Amino acid sequence: MKKSVSFIWALLLSSLPAAAQDVLPQGVTPLLLAAHNQTIDYQERTLHFDVTANVDWTCSADQEWAQTTRSTNGVFVHVPTNYASESRTATLSFKSADGHTTQELLLTQGPNNAAANLPEDKTVKASVVTANNSQSGSAASNMRDGDYSTFWHTAYGNNKFVVSESNPAIITFSFNGVERIDYINYVPRQDGTRNGDFKRVEMLVQLQGESGYKSYGTFVWASNGATKSIEPSEPILNPKSIQFKVYEGDGDFACCAEMEFCVKSQGNAEYDIFSDDLYTALKPGFTQADLDLLTNPLVQSLAYQMLNGTYSTAYRAASYECHNSPQYYSNLWNAPGKYYDQIAGVTGIHIEKGKHAIVVRDIPADMSVTLKVVAWYVGKDGGNFDGGNPNTTEFSLRNGLNVINYTYDWPGLAYICYYDGNGNSSSRAPVRVHFINGVVNGYLSRDKSNDEMHELTENAVNTCMDVVGEKVHSVWTSKGLHNYCKSIDGKVGYRQYMNVLDSLITWEQDLLGFYKYDRVPDLRTMAYTNYTYYMFQGGFGVSFHHDQERRVLNCNTLVNNDEDAIWGLSHEWGHQHQMAPYFNWAGMSEITNNMNSYYNIMRMGYKNSRDANNWKNTAKIILNDDTYKDGKHVSEHRKQAYLNRNEVSNVKLKALATSMKDSIIHAYSENPDLAVAFQELPSVDHSLGGFVRFYCYFRDHGCPDIAKDWYESLRQNNNANGSQVEKKGGVDKYELLCSAQIGDNAKWTEFKQSYPQSVWTKNSYVTPSAGWYANSVPAILNWIRKVSRLTGYNMVPYFEKWGFIRPIAMRVGDYGNKWYLMSEDMLSEFKEDMDALVDSGELKVMPEGMLEDITNYGDKYFTRPTFPN
């Protein structure tokens, strides 16, 4: 084997001055170590330790790779190259001949870092870049300044440049003296905003000496902030200019932070020793002599391990399925900004600071694949939003050998992100990935036994570990999993734990109608540990502080003893399913997601719903009408409407806000128009009562799928003919109105043309550009109309009694300031429209006593389920 040049490094094993002595002074310990630990890097070397002693002595190592040889005045220790991705240790024992004195030195050799010697691909810059349109301050030159925080953007505002098939944004990069371009990276804006992300773009190339452009293909990309790569089948040689025509961009804009033109730096000559293109095995007949001829340190390291049978491809080499993107499902479910798993390709690979070599194959030409490295622990532990949040570093991957440089100080776990933004994931072949120098952390999954998983958590390299169930991908501390993940009977319970979490999501998806209406995703949702706060809906999913792991990892606690933990998990996942504003109106952000919480604790077999007493008290408030008779209850929401009335542009609605000056809540029997609104009930838990009682009653009275149907109806709201769940035929008036208020100008135009005499049309109550924060009322009326059709009854009396429809103005602080503005004429028209459905025979009038029966209806209990382990 070809050896690196060795060197001599001396360590005096004594606390005395570094002078060689044959005999130590009387009373001095015969063998003293000045240092008990020594760390070296992965490269081969020979160490020498000077030993000064007044007795005869021996030296031995407990590992074969540390070879010791006595010298005249010490010991040589030969350490070969460490070809593994993990560090290794050996203990050197120095013993006196009589056995009475022993000193030890721990020698640690670092992991193989051959990838550090690999050159990274280079970028070449365009000499000039131009665009056919630019927003002032967002010039085309920003696409070649090397700064991801700056970007080029098409014009917006009054002079908006609308990107379309017939009006593409065109950017042209001119080159001078560039010989070769192997691939191009399109880097979208990195400020978290998706406006302008390229969604459909054509690349055209003009070579030196040519007069025209040649198309290199049209690419369809998801709008998700990830870097997109274009790699032509052959390098582009001597380019004169490269042009991009953007036919579709997010929000009808076009935006680019950087366009990187890259040249590969890796030669592939020595990689032909492998039998496959993923470099996971040597060709038959490869020998030590062949190994000695290799010069590429990475190839040499990998080949050495394979030749000696010490290299395992477990976790390091795997295939990763394509998934429909989280954004695709968010749009499909009308749940904007609420995302399922954004790091679906769990690898089990631990990434430390430095360079890493990754081979990737089979990325389709029109797709992009990224590697995300998430450091779940970043060295800071707090409890009141003062801890450390996960740090994500993202790398664009391409087919072939990728060299990434991970510069973050804290290690992370690696995830392959391979998503289709158009719902066509099933037609995509998997990509294959090999982390050549990856350190294995492993992950827990249903194909492993509990004993296998227990061993993984015990030997984890990373602070955290992934748990991959059928429905839920979660990340917890490795120590927490090892110590707290117990089954109901107290045994190791990883498999049962996955089944519990999977059941919670299955139940939520059932309530939402995903199974009934074929909306089940091919993507998991997420839960993860954090170091900053008790519980919240974070950037990846539901998150619990790590000090809560003894609760949320214990199956007996979840299933039998801790209804609150079930509520919390379901509550935060419920946020992912919230349909804003269709079923998430002003003041509803912490209410409608709790429909999922309620359903799941019932399905888990808990016999007392979390807020049963609150709902009983709410029923008394609604039915007995005593609480607000004193005239002393002031509505903060109405008060804020009055104080901020100048935010309302419509003259009549501004007058409504002005009329809220005294903000007093009245008793329903005295003034129903100014009675309590459901957003003004004592708490969000009380406000949920009206929904729960309605759901439970009709589930047991002829509408077993009431929730499934109303959710699907809302998902179909924006279809050309609206929902076909509760009705057949054309779009409903209030479906149009709801869509218009959300910002759909075409629906607003259709509404005005179809209903010219409506108060909404005549008084211009809707301004689509203002968005739904400007008024939740259209969404509320739309939902009441839908559920009335589903039940077969005109439900206006019930929802009026519960305060869903009041001719008042409210400005509700609910993750932003949201308005509720219902004028008298809006309410009157809605009641007339609902009465018309009764007159036509489509709906029935609620019989006497039904309102009270619904309001007082009990909970729906289930038998406690069992979960296999």
Regions picked out by a protein language model, each given a short descriptive name:
Residues E86-D98:
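A short beta-strand micro-motif common to beta-rich folds, especially ectodomain repeats
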Residues M453-L456, T463-Y697:
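Catalytic cores of extracellular degradative/oxidative enzymes
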Residues V23, G27, D50-F76:
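Surface-exposed binding patches on compact interaction domains or structured appendages
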Residues A269-Y315, K747-N869:
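Beta/coil-rich, acidic/histidine-enriched accessory regions frequently appended to metallopeptidases
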Residues N112-N176, R189-G196, S265-A269:
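Disordered, acidic Ser/Thr/Pro-rich linker "stalks" and the adjacent N-terminal cap
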Residues N167-P168, T193-Q266:
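Trp- and acidic/polar-enriched beta-sheet ligand-binding modules for extracellular glycan
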Residues I622-R811:
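Active-site-proximal alpha-helical
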Residues A269-G442:
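Beta-strand-enriched, solvent-exposed domains that form extended recognition/catalytic surfaces
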